[in-house]
A protein has these predicted regions:
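A conserved beta-strand-loop-helix scaffold within acyl/acetyltransferase catalytic domains
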Residues: 142-197
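Conserved N-proximal alpha/beta basic substrate-recognition cap immediately N-terminal to
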Residues: 274-303
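Acyl-donor-binding surface of acyltransferase catalytic domains
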Residues: 26-31, 48-119
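Conserved beta-strand-loop-alpha-helix junction that forms the acyl-donor binding cleft
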Residues: 56, 79-86, 230-239, 256-261
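Conserved acetyl-CoA-binding loop-helix of GNAT-fold acetyltransferases
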Residues: 59-68, 196-199, 205-218, 244-245
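Conserved active-site alpha-helix within GNAT-family acetyltransferase domains
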Residues: 64-66, 83-98, 210, 222, ...
Length: 303
């Protein structure tokens, strides 16, 4: 699957804006560009888990099976799932529909910032010290650290990580991961995506998160790509407001994950057990992990 990337003409791009990513659409675009069809489903390891590229899977059962192969302590994500009900039907007890929205920014809609960021600089990750700084940020935000030995190599379409550091102290204050879809799975539409944006909760510099998003957008624009996608929790209104300001719009596609202790709050949601004391919560959480239904009769009394 090699060849020159053919980006859509403006009139074709308008049509693409209302079309969801699917396996059939990807194969049609590859055929249209006289490129080889995808030979097998593709996934990219990001150091904390795999991104399973949903539109490279011709079969829902195979996607469900691959999600069930998630390694202990990792977090796999199946993105661009067109028919999530078909995938969930193969493992309803182990998989769940992620309550996040996918947003897309077409680069033709992007407007650069009027002023450059001040007080920090953004650069690529190079050293072991850089990775340690990134993992410190992720752990501070309750996110999984990056296992560098697990990363898909860059020459095989692996991700790229960026670091924002304080201009005065050199201390890392933010990080973000980007994926070039043209390199990752020969995406004929010239897409890219943003993952794992994190800013130090103690950072006093304003605008670090927005600057990292803009940096990634402008980086992929310089690579002649067409759009950037990202995923945001459906009720994160503050983040959504920022993304809308930058030109992102909702995309009709879905994400599926495997149930684990890391994402438990996403598939359980708040319930009456929220008012239980810490010791009762331990028992309830363990019951949920084992798939046991819990009924709270008296939260104050721990019953």
């Amino acid at each position: 699957m090699k060849g020159h990337l053919h980006l859509p003409h403006p009139h074709n791009q308008r049509l693409q804006r209302i079309q969801a990513p699917t396996y059939e659409r990807l194969q049609a675009r590859l055929a249209e560009d006289h490129s080889e069809p995808t030979e097998k489903p593709l996934s990219i390891h990001c150091g904390w888990g795999r991104l399973l590229i949903g539109q490279t899977y011709p079969d829902a059962e195979e996607l469900a099976r691959d999600l069930l192969q998630e390694a202990p302590g990792e977090r796999d994500i199946a993105l661009y799932v067109a028919a999530p009900q078909q995938v969930l039907a193969h493992a309803p007890q182990q998989l769940f529909l992620d309550p996040s929205d996918t947003l897309r920014l077409w680069f033709t809609d992007y407007r650069p910032a009027r002023r450059p960021p001040r007080g920090f600089r953004i650069r690529r990750v190079h050293t072991e010290e850089d990775w340690a700084a990134i993992n410190r940020l992720y752990l501070a935000r309750g996110m999984l650290p990056v296992q560098t030995e697990r990363l898909s190599p860059r020459h095989q379409g692996g991700p790229i990580y960026w670091l924002a550091e304080d201009a005065d102290t050199g201390v890392a204050v933010g990080t973000v991961m980007g994926l070039n879809h043209a390199k990752a799975f020969q995406d004929p539409e010239g897409g890219s995506s943003l993952w794992c944006l994190a800013v130090d909760p103690q950072c006093s510099r304003p605008g670090v998160g927005e600057a990292l998003v803009r940096h990634l957008v402008e980086h992929f624009m310089s690579r002649e790509l067409a759009y950037l996608d990202l995923s945001v929790l459906h009720n994160n209104q503050q983040a959504k407001a920022l993304y809308r300001k930058l030109g992102f719009r909702e995309l009709a596609t879905f994400t599926i994950k495997r149930k684990n202790g890391i994402n438990q709050s996403l598939f359980l949601g708040p319930g009456p057990e929220e008012d239980l004391n810490p010791y009762a919560r331990i028992i309830v959480d363990e019951a949920h992990r084992r798939g046991i239904e819990v009924r709270v009769d008296d939260a104050e009394g721990g019953l």
